[in-house]
UniProtKB/Swiss-Prot annotation:
It comes from Mus musculus (Mouse). It is found in: Cytoplasm. Residues 869-889 form a coiled coil. Keywords: Coiled coil, Cytoplasm, Repeat, WD repeat. Acts as a negative regulator of cell migration, invasion, and metastasis downstream of p53/TP53, through inhibition of Arp2/3 complex-mediated actin polymerization. Via its association with the multisubunit axonemal dynein complex, is potentially involved in the regulation of cilia function. May play a role in osteogenesis of dental tissue-derived mesenchymal stem cells. The lineage of its organism: Eukaryota, Metazoa, Chordata, Craniata, Vertebrata. The gene is Dnai3. GO terms for biological process: negative regulation of Arp2/3 complex-mediated actin nucleation; negative regulation of cell migration; positive regulation of osteoblast differentiation. WD repeats lie at residues 398-438, 480-536, 702-741, 745-785. This is Dynein axonemal intermediate chain 3.
Amino acid sequence: MAPKPPKSPKGQKKGKKNMKQQLLVPEEEEPMNMESMGHPEIYPLVLTTKTQEIFNCRVDEDMTDEQTYKLIKKEDILADLQNRAAVSDFHPVKKIVREYPGEELLLVYDKDFKYGLNFYLIGTEDGKENFLKPPEVPEEQEEPKEHVQEDVYVYNPPVSKPWVSLGSEKEIEEESVQESGKRVTYMISRKRSEFGAPVTFSDQNASSVKDAYIECTSYPEKNYTLSQVEKDVGLQVIAEVKDTSTQTKWAFPKNATTQYYPREFSEEEKSLIGKSKSLVDFFNNVSTSVEVALQQNEIMNTFIDDWKNLAEEESTFGDKTDTHLKEYQSFTDLHNTMEKMITCVSWHPTIFGLIVVSVAVRLSYEERVQNSGRLLLQPSLLLFWSFSDPIHPQLMLESPDDIFCFEFCPSDPNIIAGGCINGQIVLWDITAHADRIENIKTGGHRSKKTSLKPMFLLEPDSNKESMYIRHCAVSSIENGHRKVITDIHWLPDSFEINRMGSVFENRSGINCQLVTCSADCTICFWDIRPQKPAVTAAAAASAATTATNNANSQQSPVEKKKEENIDIPFDVPSTFLHLDLSWKPLSRLKLSKGDTSLDHCPTKLSLGEDPFLCKIQGTSSIHIILRDKMLSQIKMVKTSEINPYQNLEAGIANILKPIEDFCTKFFVGTEEGEVIYTDWKMERDSDTGRLMAKKPVSLYTVHDGAVHTIQRSPFFNDIVLTVGGWNVAIWKEEVMTGPLLQTCCGPKRYTAGHWSLTRPGVFYIGREDGNVDIWDLLEKTHEPAQSQNICITMITYIKPWTFSSKQQFIAVADYYGTLHILEIPWTLSHPSLNEVSSVNYYFEREVRHLEYVQQRKEIREQEKIDMALELVKKKAKIYQKTKEQMEAELKLEYESYLDLEKSVLFALGLSKVSEKKSYLDSH
């Protein structure tokens, strides 16, 4: 808004005269000229295309490099000023044009913008004449200049003059750095008693002495504020918004109901209408359209809203911007006085909200030997934790020693197999207690809608008393592992193997075999079915039975029955009674270190997982179908009268043909950080005839510590994640050139890891400082996408679990025996569009990169071999000299000898003048 004009003095009214004076003010302003550059007669102008056409001075047409000026009549310029007024481009020089004495003004085209604009006007007659006719220097004046003698330069020494301040010293002072505070002065001296004593210096660690090293780290200045330069403020005067409503008062309430029913045809009318020609013709006409519509409904949903499907699901529990794991619940065994750590974690396959952990005493081997008597008083347990009761375990499974690994049977979750620290395998059967833990899941009368909202907030009811359950079978101590079992897996129910490692079809349809690895450098395969006895063994058994009966003929049958019943406790199921203390491995595999007599020490292994087992945790439609299929099979086992594990029969692999095209290779991680890809098939030694393991297909020393995790991706069966030491690696099966991804050394040692169950490019890594690194291959491949602190001690195990498409949990176990249940945020549980194909493309690109590196390596090695051969050839080549060259060399050598002889004789004063002869003349 323009400011108001000031009022006229003495209250005079503003009239037209004053307005005219105000309008004439801008015309009286002097136009801009080039007086500062020494040309006061030049006035720069900007001529638009319209003006150039009016005065015929168009650029590159009328005005060129040869013709750079034009004479314009004064009358034409004044006419243009009168017609276009202030719009005219000559308006800034209106005063100059009017006062110009001549009839024509000179307009010059300024192509190089020497004076800032594209044209300039010469406002004086002298300037016009000087431009059109520049003064020429006569030749007579130029010639004497050539003969003028140049001035001789005389050096004048500088003389000091008084300094005149022009303001530059202020700028120098502003740019200079000056100390604002006083310096702190320290005086360090020795004791007076040590004056004059010899001084000896030595190295000292700054961290070992208190207050020996003080670090001054940088930090952001809190007092720094950014001044606000501009601010947009809007104001509007409106009335306040008011909410008003009206409602008719219901003075006399009255209950009333109305019911409608359709009018129906009678039986006669129905028969007549059904036989009518119009109805038949109608069905004949529309039958084709109805069939097409039904086919379309079978092919695709024609009523789907594609626009809504472009967006991702909004109905989630957390915020999409939240990327951190949230603590949901934690479990700690408060009843055990011994300090224990969690060694293994597994979610129940069918009961949501039930998680099982194994605990072990935090003692070394020497400490275990010293405290062996105390350890016998504390039972080794598997704890069943429920979200409804975080204090009391629901079940506690006893074992002969601490369990370091266990796994649920995929065919029947009531069967659990575990590996002990003493090398024994333990089997539990909790079928008799299945109702107890299933009732915990339902938690009384609860609706389906309630179970989907903050889950597992259940009343513990009468489940506060923990129940101890004994194992039903353990393996033989003499024939099993000698050291701690580090990993255990159930073989898929689709196949079984024999003692040679050959693969056969498993027609029983249930999981009957296990594989274990131990620190005693062995990998064992186990079969839970009874072995079929041979004829000789049966005869020996019958003979032994006869001898026993003869020796115990004095005992009555009743006493014998009592003795047999005493050996079997009443609370132990007889499912695997045939294995107890007599269970032997089906085959034993040792990974030899080549020429030496030592063997590799396996810590983790990964078989070729069955797709039905590895994809059961997905959230897509096929995953839901597979999960429902597994649950239906388990339900059929429960409803059937006979459990298939109650009446196990010996395998029929001996009468079947082996499967030839089955992949029998698997990954093994060792204690030295090696990743081995080997075959479990055995071969006979040609010298000794004994069964031996095949040579490993490939061996890589990637990790600088023991391998803690080997796991296949739930989305790509040939992609394997390995965690050990200070780094992480991702491998692809059948790719022998190396890992697809190998991270750099982390800040702390890695102790656990697991793939995400719903995002193919995400995996979780646990560290020894209690942090969890979350890797996202689509975001970063050189470092974790984010890192979050979970506890203050080492993380020992990580296990995620998907409850529904909206909620996902991850269990993190630590060294102090605490199990942390964390809720995974929306961004880490929901894959992006085409994430599977994007991650697959990344792996394929890395495979091509490895192939290229291998090709370059082979080419470089071949180049080195070729260069070595060429060097050998050059050295072996003998240079043959000609006769003339040999004579010339001898001549030079003889002449140098004569010169030396002459110099020696001359130095001794025995020199004689003699004619020098050549070497050829002397001969």
